Amino acid sequence: MNFCKLEIFIPETHLKILQETLAEHDAGHIGKYDSCISYYHVKGTWRPLEGANPYKGEKDTLSVEDELKVEVTCRVENLDTIIEAVKKIHPYEEPVINAIPLIRTGL
C-alpha cells in the first residue's frame, strides 16, 4: 500500500468539520485506530489580488492571521476523493492542501 501525508491549512473554527470529513473518508486510519491527526498553530499570510473573493482580508492588502496546519496520513488511492471532500468544507477560496508521498511509515 502507498501512503501520503496531507498538510491542510485551515482556520481553527473549521477544525471539527475537517476532522469529521477526514474520518468519513478514512484519512487518519492507522492500524486499529482512526481519526489520527496532528495540528499546530501557525501564522498564515496572503494578499488578495484583483478578482479574489477572500474568506478574510481586503484586496491588495497583506493579511496575517492565525490558522492551523493539520497533518494526516491517507492511502494514495483515496487522495483525490479526500481532497475534493476537504475543498467542499474549506472556507478559503484557494485552500492550501499539500500531498507528500511517504516512503516509509510505521503502518
Question: What is each residue range found by the language model?
Answer:
Residues M1-L107:
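Hydrophobic structural segments
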